[in-house]
UniProtKB/Swiss-Prot annotation:
Keywords: Autoinducer synthesis, Iron, Lyase, Metal-binding, Quorum sensing. Involved in the synthesis of autoinducer 2 (AI-2) which is secreted by bacteria and is used to communicate both the cell density and the metabolic potential of the environment. The regulation of gene expression in response to changes in cell density is called quorum sensing. Catalyzes the transformation of S-ribosylhomocysteine (RHC) to homocysteine (HC) and 4,5-dihydroxy-2,3-pentadione (DPD). Homodimer. This is S-ribosylhomocysteine lyase. The keyword Iron-sulfur does not apply. Its cofactor is Fe cation.
Length: 171
């Protein structure tokens, strides 16, 4: 099986919260697509609570679009990582990491402004697969933590696993 890009970086050296360009590619028509690793938690040391991360998933996608879309950038999707340490964001365009970090912080400020669980988008049986698994309080705790710790930039060059280590891991 081919090695996915996300498994070629050393998760033991990854900082959080931090932005990292996980992948760049071009469509057959030449449009640039960038995938960002938005790391909320230090891998293997922290994890987002499931209810809070689910609520954040509903809020984060819209708020990030409000702050990042435009000037050659359009978000395609923001999806939570299965390990619950962050989100992947796929978009058209090539914004630099600092622009993404600034939008992320602004989105976290927006999460803190949500006053009631009823303001969570698509929070109903028709539009959400587990509509009862939400916590606005946990989502706001996550947002507060991001803002208190600030958002850094993770460098692929600094996190790259050496080829010897990949071979040792039988990858």
């Amino acid at each position: 099986m081919p090695l996915l890009d996300s498994f070629t970086v050393d998760h033991t050296r990854m900082e959080a919260p931090a932005v990292r360009v996980a992948k760049t590619m071009n469509t057959p028509h030449g449009d640039a697509i960038t995938v960002f690793d938005l790391r909320f938690c230090v891998p293997n040391k922290e994890v987002m609570p499931e209810r809070g991360s689910h609520t954040l998933e509903h809020l984060f996608a819209g708020f990030m679009r409000n702050h990042l879309n435009g000037n050659g950038v359009e978000i395609i999707d923001i999806s939570p990582m299965g390990c619950r340490t962050g989100f992947y964001m796929s978009l058209i365009g090539t914004p630099d990491e600092q622009r993404v970090a600034d939008a992320w912080k602004a989105a976290m400020e927006d999460v803190l402004k949500v006053q009631d669980q009823n303001q969570i988008p698509e929070l109903n049986v028709y539009q959400c697969g587990t509509y009862q698994m939400h916590s606005l309080q946990e989502a706001q705790d996550i947002a507060r933590s991001i803002l208190e710790r600030d958002v850094r930039i993770n460098s692929n060059e600094e996190l790259a696993l050496p080829k010897e280590k990949l071979q040792e891991l039988h990858i």
